[in-house]
Amino acid sequence: MDALFETYAKLRKRMALYRVRAVPNQNYRRDGTKSYVSALNRFGFQPTKPGPYFQIFEKSEEAPSMPVAPGVKPGHVWRGLFKKITGQEEPGEVTAEDQQNDSEYLCEVMIGTAWTAERQIVKMHFDTGSGDFWVRDKSFDPKKSVTWKLAEDKSWKVQYGDGSSASGIMGHDILIIGGIQIKRQAIEIATEMSAQFTEGSMDGILGLAFSKRNTVRTDGEADPQRTVVDNMMAQDDIPPEAELFTAALYSNIEEDLRSFYTFGWIDEDIVKASGEEIVWADVDNSEGLWMFSSEQVTIDDQQVRIEGNKAIADTGTPLVLVSDQVCEALYAHIPGAEYSEEYQGWTIPRETEVDKLPQFRIAIGDKEFIIQKGDLIFAPTDKGVFYGSVQSRGENSFDVLGTAFLKSIYAIWDQGRKRFGAVTKIEAFIPPTKYDRPRLTDEDRKELGVIIGYGDISSTFFEKRA
């Protein structure tokens, strides 16, 4: 590894590469059920546990050869995501209010001529589960970029099960990310957006999955464009060992400012601090996702084998989604934990001491990695319980290892060699008491200028001020 790190050091010096800070989004508010509904909308899988939300599918000979979402079975058309309404026989529509519409972290990139007045800085959500790089039309003005070139015959559209969508035009421009200048990057500008896409703080999404998941069409025909990493790899100044990107995401509120991504190099300090060698797992990208073998979990001393099981590493999902078998085994080790049909998820008693939670390990290839105990708790609810970070994947065919898991490792997406790497990330533990602050009174709200309460949660952390 020393020779490899020396190569990265030289590359960083020659190209002035730097860490891309993943800055905590101050408007992001954790909500367990909303995050789960967002996952249903994102992946399109049918829940296997009871709750208000469900999918409707229909068998059809006209179903696309590649399903519109990973959870949609071949030969089926996804009619949408719906919710049960008390007192009604007909299901209701899922709206922006039912789901999480913002990103936990925001990352700055530049579009346009580097280091000139024409460049435009946008705050993006880095998403390893999608393949489009799109920005809101109000966040990027192509008329101000002398290097922008519109592709008049191309369009794009991202659409989800609740009927929400974002769509618009496409062109090419220069992108600067982590010090790397990428020429002729396909940039999609959202000129039409549903409420789900307009309510968040991000300027857009930078997809880091494979190009198979890109939605661009030329004259109406599918024409997937190269992703950011595809274009980075195609450049002569990027050697084969640099055809990758990495992420170090931190869970503690005090640690958040340290979260970052790198493009083209692996951070030597973090790897050496772990005292471990990087563990690699081969990636199956046939669905355009970062999918690898994950056939085992361990809860304390209980080992659960799932032959042939696969998982994806997904920065676009905050939760960890696993089989019902694994969920039941995990929560059986937490006294008082139970499944809530109301919240459509597993819950943990509020009085649970974090250090009494079980050790939960998930395999990446041949090695298991532990989820830090504090990250097993996702968010409080209004019923005196916590919503767990580990939830059911329903009928989805693979696990989803979201940021609740990724915060425990230094993650490496090696696109050139089609493999995913990880080492344990050392992090001092701080109990998540800041997610459980005292509830505000009406007088408190007036004094603090609180104008919006998120769900039924009332605390200084989960409410927005004027």
Question: Where do the language-model regions lie?
Answer:
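Flexible, small-/acidic-enriched active-site or ligand-binding loops
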Residues: 256-308, 382-385
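Long, repeat-rich segments with strong aromatic
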Residues: 297, 306, 315-324, 329
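Short, solvent-exposed aromatic-acidic interface loops
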Residues: 187-195, 376-380, 425-429
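A short acidic Gly-Thr/Ser loop motif
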Residues: 125-131, 312-318, 324-325, 402
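C-terminal, well-structured subdomains that either form a transmembrane helix-short loop-helix hairpin
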Residues: 307-319, 397-413
